A protein has these predicted regions:
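Conserved small/polar residues in nucleotide/adenosyl-binding loops
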Residues: 162-164
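Structural motif
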Residues: 57-61, 103-108, 148-155
Length: 164
């Protein structure tokens, strides 16, 4: 009887243990080799957007996790802009970026299909700090500083910025 109880306890304990997270050494090694440092990751489907530092300068990088290769982002990484936060849509077509440019912090939307950014004004005005783009690429959550207080704004993007 004791053996049955012990066996039953062992089955219960092993059945209740949660699976362990599985690191991806192949992808992690690739990510470490491509830049000196990387921060602010955002996953969207098969896409990983992050801020990578190379040669003392940070830039937005997009990695296609299926092909394990970086994706060109023409028109996004400007010499006069310092990215602060990035988020990618599930289809990898839109990236929302908070960046410091010409002594102001701004929120921009980058559309890969046209290779251009568009500034997104905040109403009421404030200083954006972090951004999160939903999987559909239609809505943003933005952490904003206003009058010494942190707020979160939810923004629905206009249809003209959504359609590819």
């Amino acid at each position: 009887m004791i053996r049955v109880a012990l066996l039953f306890s062992l089955v219960l304990v092993s059945g209740c243990s949660s699976p362990r997270p599985t690191p991806r050494p192949d992808l992690n090694g690739l990510l470490r080799q491509s830049v000196n440092s990387r921060r602010d990751p955002s996953l969207g489907g098969r896409w990983l957007a992050s801020l990578g530092q190379r040669n003392g300068r940070e830039r937005v990088e997009l990695i296609d996790l299926r092909s394990r290769s970086p994706v060109p982002l023409p028109g996004l990484n400007r010499a006069d802009a310092q990215p602060i936060s990035v988020s990618v849509s599930a289809d990898g077509q839109r990236l929302a970026v908070v960046q410091q440019r010409e002594d102001r912090t701004e929120l921009v939307l980058y559309r890969r299909n046209v290779g251009a950014t568009q500034r997104l004004p905040l109403d009421p005005p404030g200083v954006p700090r972090r951004v999160s783009l939903d999987g559909s690429g239609r809505r943003l959550a933005v952490q904003v500083s206003r009058n010494g207080r942190w707020d979160v704004d939810l923004i629905r993007l206009p249809l003209s910025l959504i359609h590819i």
